[in-house]
């Protein structure tokens, strides 16, 4: 595998409340130079929670996604706060979005959702032994919680 491209420069193009668009000037191992844009964030990352109501039922949430301009059914997720472990952030987001906490949390993997243009990482966390507890969240409207059998995931 070749060495990563050499970075000749970085500059901020635009800042928003949550993200920054950054241009990165690169030189590849064959001498080819390109400028790419990427989204950078706080660097804290995010969590994607797999909340298991029982061994065969995952709890999904239906929420509006502005990127797709439609409501989507998916796993609860959110940004990590400062001074918060991955497990603490996952449990907080679970309480805010689903109305449950978890007695058992396990980090399954850490991944990039869009490695071509995003710098932050998402931690996928399995949440088991759920108990009812709701925290106020930052969602603009209540989220619909939808139990889904693992044996029926192919129908999503």
Task: Cite the ranges covered by each PLM segment.
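N-terminal positively charged helical leader segments and presequences
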Residues: 1-11
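Acidic, metal-coordinating catalytic segment for phosphate/diphosphate chemistry
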Residues: 10-48, 53-54
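Acidic pyrophosphate-coordinating catalytic loop
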Residues: 12-17, 29, 41, 66, ...
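Short small-residue beta-strand/loop micro-motif enriched in glycine and branched aliphatics
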Residues: 30-35, 70-72, 133-136
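A glycine-rich, hydrophobic loop/mini-helix early in the fold
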Residues: 39, 43-77
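Unchanged
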Residues: 45-48, 53, 78-156
